[in-house]
Structures are given as structure tokens and as C-alpha cells.
Amino acid sequence: MILDKHIVVVTGASRGIGRSIAVELARQGATVIGTATSESGAEGISEALKEFGGQSRGAVLNVTDAAASEAFIDGVVKEFGGLNVLVNNAGITKDQLAMRMKDDEFDAVIDTNLRAVFRLSRAVLRPMMKARGGRIINITSVVASSGNPGQANYAAAKAGVAGMTRALAREIGSRGITVNCIAPGFIDTDMTRALNEQQIAGLLQQIPLGRFGLPEDIAAAVGFLASSHASYITGTTIHVNGGMYMS
């Protein structure tokens, strides 16, 4: 299998895109530790990964807790002897028009969607450098490039992740570590299912392919970047959005 003997951490893996990423990487042979914020979420991840055997499982982690994040990565490295792939997928939204957005709504999104990505990436650098190889894959968003009303906090965080990705790629490329982004467009998840028919119709008009993407579309792109097929790709963003945004 492509990712046989690979140790992978996927944050925010209890549902949606994160769940599909964890399942896809396990299907490719990796040992996957997927994180959730609750015990029930972690148990759901373990159940989803059970069919692939091995030691793949769910784990509880609050990515905004700096000490817990560092301890979690240290624990994975000690248990398995290393860490090959980190997928920073965990994220939240607190949408609000800018003139009404409170500081705590802005800060919460930055803390989860940007600061936590930096902390976890920093935590994996030492073991990856020691192994002289690794993959850091960050899930950003189409709105980091296109913008979106009511999402100044979310767009700022995701654009920050894209910039940080490029900086890290230049910083650690000589150690054999690649750092890339996947930028999903509108994906068929709980969030898009909550939209009304008028909102859905308006969004579909902006997408040349005429449909929302599937979580599996994002998982396939992550699987590619995690594999040896992407060994010469770093510092880039792969847009998976049906043509909604083109660069």
C-alpha cells in the first residue's frame, strides 16, 4: 500500500472532511490517529477506522491547548517511533458581519484555525527533521483567496495558514519535509446542508462544475500530497472547488 508503515495525525477527524481524510489515509495503509474534541467523537473515529485493522484510532485533543497539543504529538512519536504526516484540518466558524463581530469571535477563530496549526506544525518539526522527511498538509479554504462576506475572521485565519505554509516550506525544505495546503470550495457537509434552497442555488451559479464537492474529493487530494508521488511539491495550494476560484 502507498502509505504502508506511515504514521499520520489528522486533527478534526470526527466528521465531514476530516473523517474522510482519516479513512482515506487508513485505506492507503497508514496508521492514523484522528483527533476530536470529545470522547464520543474519538470513539466514532475509532469505529470508522476499525475495518482497516492495525492501531489506527481516535483520540481526544483540544487543539487550542498548547501544552496538550505538544504532549499529544510527543506521545504519538514515543508510541510509534516517529510521525510521517500531519494533517491540520480542525477548524471552527463564527460568522458575523465585521461591524458586529466581537473580539472574542475573531480571536476564537484565529486561535483554532491559525495559532493551533502553527503549534502542531512546530511540534512535529523535531521528529520530522530527525527522520529527514515528513509531510505537513494544511486544510485552508477557497475564502482565503476569494473572500466571503461575514467571514473576516475565517478568511484571515485561512489566508494566514496559506502564508505560513509557504514560509515553512522554504524554511524546512532542505530537511526533506514538504508543507502544502488543500483549499476546499463548498463541500457537501453538515454546514452546506444547513443552507436554504436560495442560498444553495446562488452558490451553485458560481461553480462551473455545477455541484458541491464531496469530502472524498478533499481526502483524495490529501492522499496524493501524503504520498511519494508528491515528493517534489511544496509550498503550494491545491484548490479543490469545482472551478469556483481559479488562480
Labelled PLM ranges:
Residues R126, R170-S174, S231:
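Alpha-helical segment proximal to the catalytic Tyr-Lys
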Residues S141:
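Residue(s) in the substrate-gating loop at a strand-loop-helix junction
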Residues S121, A157, T165:
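Active-site helix of classical SDR
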Residues L97-A98, K102-I110, T192, L203:
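Substrate-binding pocket helix/loop in short-chain dehydrogenase/reductase
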Residues G173, T178, I233-G235, N241:
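Short, small/polar-rich loop/turn modules that mediate ligand/substrate recognition or access, typified
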Residues I7, S14-R15:
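Conserved glycine-rich cofactor-binding loop
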Residues Q28-G44:
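Conserved glycine-rich Rossmann-like NAD(P)H-binding loop of the short-chain dehydrogenase/reductase
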